[in-house]
């Protein structure tokens, strides 16, 4: 079956999903969560095959972490589906209502986007997360995962499709592309008359490929080069907590810290504390000349380091003269993802917030909160640094659009 045929079937199924009541979608997602739990053994066995193949190919540790499933992670995925089931339904929400002087009633109402293509790499959890979010928002979804997770993705998709069938919803509403040839993905990205939106999740190379070759609209972020600026007024203990949580808890996440900027006035006090805490957590440090004057044992940092999304236990460091220098550094090397300031100066905090265009800006809070669930969206399908349609972590609302519904009693314009 061709990718165009699959997409057409998904579009037809999306029409069915768009008509489901909120209660029906909630019950469907609960059933999908139960199906994952029922198939846990099959899914974990499939994931073990993927992990074995990935290790044999020498896959990087960050990628292996994203690929791996276990009982706890699978239970977390099922729990996430149940959380999505209970989220408020954005479909049908009236966001504006007005009666015009001629008596027509004008409403802006949220409706599903239609068919969403998810293009992703070694993240089997995305198969379930994306399916749940797209269906809750009344859409069909075409899932094209990476070859690294093919067995995991098939096992997860089969379980979810069974729940769709049992609810009398066409299983094409959740279409997994098993043909992983690049030309098939290219064809999918050209189907702008069928597919309404593409969302790539993965490495910078994949995302740039999708953005450069798609005729379908794309929401994306290329990478997460996230900074922590420790201001002169920062509380040391607070700044250390933000640094450790942001860098060492899950370095493979796109909201982890990649660069530490420290105000020159506190560098001699803060850097040794930071270095000790990070070394205890096996973080490799690289710094500029001013940083290495305080920490001579660390490696020098290059321009490439400051622009890098390491996704690993590596941190670039730089001493800056003031807030303006920190802002200039972030503008030069940042990726508009997430930036953090540790400060007790409210004026500097406000300048930091107002001076950056990043999708998420944090004041005295960890970069790891740059996540749809943590920010109150309930769940997230991705993070956008594209300013059109959606910006920042994207939840259910980002998978809908507003349209006008006008009700009258025979009014005409002329």
Curated annotation (Swiss-Prot):
EC number of this enzyme: 1.2.1.41
Enzyme class, first EC level, given as a word: oxidoreductase
A Gene Ontology molecular function term of the record: glutamate-5-semialdehyde dehydrogenase activity
Catalytic reaction equation(s): L-glutamate 5-semialdehyde + phosphate + NADP(+) = L-glutamyl 5-phosphate + NADPH + H(+)
Record carries keyword Oxidoreductase: yes
PROSITE patterns: PROA
Involved pathway(s): Amino-acid biosynthesis; L-proline biosynthesis; L-glutamate 5-semialdehyde from L-glutamate: step 2/2
GO cellular component, as recorded: cytoplasm
UniProt cross-references to NCBIfam families, sorted A to Z: PRK00197.1, proA
Annotated HAMAP family: ProA (MF_00412)
Family of the protein in this entry: Belongs to the gamma-glutamyl phosphate reductase family.
Name of protein: Gamma-glutamyl phosphate reductase
Organism, as annotated: Xanthomonas oryzae pv. oryzae (strain PXO99A)
């Amino acid at each position: 079956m061709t990718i165009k045929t699959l997409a057409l079937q998904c579009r037809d199924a999306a029409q069915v999903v768009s008509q489901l009541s909120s209660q029906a979608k909630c019950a469907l997602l609960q059933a999908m969560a139960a199906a994952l739990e029922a198939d846990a053994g099959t899914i974990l066995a499939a994931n073990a095959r993927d992990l074995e193949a990935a290790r044999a190919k020498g896959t990087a540790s960050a990628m292996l972490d994203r690929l791996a499933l276990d009982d706890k992670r699978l239970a977390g995925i099922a729990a996430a589906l149940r959380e999505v089931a209970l989220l408020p339904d954005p479909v049908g929400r009236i966001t504006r209502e007005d009666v015009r002087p001629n008596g027509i009633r004008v409403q802006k109402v949220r409706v599903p986007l239609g068919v969403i293509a998810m293009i992703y790499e070694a993240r089997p959890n995305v198969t379930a997360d994306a399916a749940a979010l797209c269906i809750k928002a009344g859409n069909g979804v075409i899932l094209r995962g990476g070859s690294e997770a093919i067995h995991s993705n098939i096992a997860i998709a089969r379980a979810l499709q069974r729940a769709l069938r049992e609810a009398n919803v066409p299983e094409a509403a959740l279409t997994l592309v098993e043909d992983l040839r690049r030309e098939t993905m290219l064809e999918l990205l050209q189907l702008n008359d069928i597919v309404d939106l593409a969302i790539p999740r993965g490495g910078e190379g994949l995302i740039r490929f999708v953005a450069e070759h798609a005729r379908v609209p794309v929401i994306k972020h290329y990478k997460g080069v996230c900074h922590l600026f420790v201001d002169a007024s920062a509380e040391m203990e607070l700044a250390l907590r933000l640094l450790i949580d942001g860098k060492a808890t899950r370095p493979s996440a796109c909201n982890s810290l990649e660069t530490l900027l420290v105000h020159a006035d506190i560098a001699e006090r803060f850097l040794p504390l930071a270095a000790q805490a990070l070394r205890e957590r096996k973080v490799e440090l690289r710094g500029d000349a001013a940083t290495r004057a305080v920490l001579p044992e660390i490696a020098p940092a290059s321009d490439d380091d400051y622009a890098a999304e390491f996704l690993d236990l590596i941190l670039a460091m730089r001493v800056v003269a003031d807030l303006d220098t920190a802002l200039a550094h972030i503008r030069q090397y940042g990726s508009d993802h997430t930036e953090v300031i540790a400060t007790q100066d409210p004026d500097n905090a406000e300048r930091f917030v107002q001076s950056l265009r990043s999708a998420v800006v944090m004041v005295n809070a960890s970069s790891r909160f740059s996540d749809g669930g943590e920010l109150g969206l309930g769940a997230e399908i991705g993070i956008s640094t594209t300013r059109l349609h959606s910006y920042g972590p994207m939840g259910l609302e980002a998978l809908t659009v507003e349209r006008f519904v006008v009700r009258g009693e025979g009014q005409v314009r002329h």
